[in-house]
Amino acid sequence: YTDAEHPMTQKEIQQKLETEYDMVVDRKAVKANLEDFINDGTYNIDYATKIRFSPNPKTGELEKNEILTGVYYNAEFTDSELRLLMDSVLFSKSIPSANKSEILDKLKDLSNKYFKFSAANIQSYESADREMNKELFYTIEILDEAIKNGLQVKFLYNEYGADKKLHHRLNEDGEVREYIINPYYMVATGGKYYLICNYDKYDNIAHYRLDRISNIEILDTPRKAKNQVEGLVGLDIARYMNEHIYMFHGKSVKAKFEAPKYLISDILDYFKADVNFKELENDQVLATVKVNETDMQLWARQYCGQIKMIEPQSLAEACKQDILDALALYED
C-alpha cells in the first residue's frame, strides 16, 4: 500500500487494519509495532518524524514527543528497475508465454498497488510463434547444479522443422544424437540463453542454445579441467561475448572494414566500445575490432551494400563470395 510517494500516517494504518483486516488497534499498539519493525532492521521501512507537545497527564506540563509519520515500505526494486526486469522477461525470445505470465506476476508482487504494468499483450505476442521449449527452466537448474559441482551433463539437442516444432537432432545414421558436454558458463545475449561448454569429443569451446536443449541429465563423471579446453583458461566473459555477437564458436580475428559515418551508432550497438574508428574521406570511417570470424561474416551480410571488408583477406574474400552467391539466387 505504500512507497516513497504514498506514505501512511499511524492513523491511516489504524484505519487500514480495521477496514481490510477487521483488526481494531489503538495508536500505542501501532506505534509500538512500527518501532519494533524499524529497530529490528530486517524490514526496509522508512519514515518521517514530527514533534508534538502535549500535557503530561500527571503534572500538566507540556512534554515533547516524537511522532512517527509518513511511514512507507522501501522496496528492494524501484519501479523503473522492476519495469526493466519485467520488460526483459516480456521480450525474451526463449521463455514460453505461460512462464512469462507467472514470472511477471511474481515480479509485480514485489511492488505495490500503485505500480502499473500491463502484460495483456503477451498472448497475442506469442500466439503465432513457434513451439517453445517448456524445459528451459529445468535445463537452467540442472546446468547450474552441474557447473557448481564440476560435473558433465548429457542432453538431446533440437532444431525446428517446417512444422515449426522442435525435433531432435540426428546423427549420420538417422538416430537421435546424444551430447556429452562439459559445462562452464551460462550467458545471455540478444534475448537468448547460451551454454559455453566443451563437447567432450573435442578440445575447443562450443556454444548451445539453452532453449534448444531437452532431456538433460547430470552425469557422475567430472567435467574436463579448463586447461584441457583451448581458450578457456583466463577467459574474459565480457570480452568474449563482445567478440561473439551471434555466438558462433571458433577463432577471433582483428577485422577492419570501411563504413559510412551514419552507421557508427549501429556498429557500436553490436561491437560496443571495443571497436576503434579512424576517419577517412567522403564521410567514411575505418573500423577495427576483434571479433569471431564467422560472426563478422554474418554481420557483414546485413550491410553488404554499405560496408567493405578490408582485413583479414580471407574474410574479405568470404564476404565477397557471399554477395556473389546472393546475386546468383536472383539470376534466371
Q: Where do the PLM segments sit?
A:
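A generic structural signal for beta-strand entry/edge sites
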Residues: 5, 152, 192, 281-288
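General beta-strand recognition
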Residues: 63, 154, 194-196, 286, ...
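Short, basic/aromatic recognition patches that contact phosphate-bearing ligands
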Residues: 1-91, 174, 180, 327-332
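Polybasic (Lys/Arg-rich)
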Residues: 234-332
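Bulky hydrophobic/aromatic content
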Residues: 70-167
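Core beta-strand-centered patch of the WYL/Sm-like small regulatory domain
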Residues: 127-256
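Secondary-structure transition/turn motif
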Residues: 67-76, 198-201, 290-293
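Short beta-strand micro-motifs enriched in acidic
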Residues: 50-54, 187-189, 280
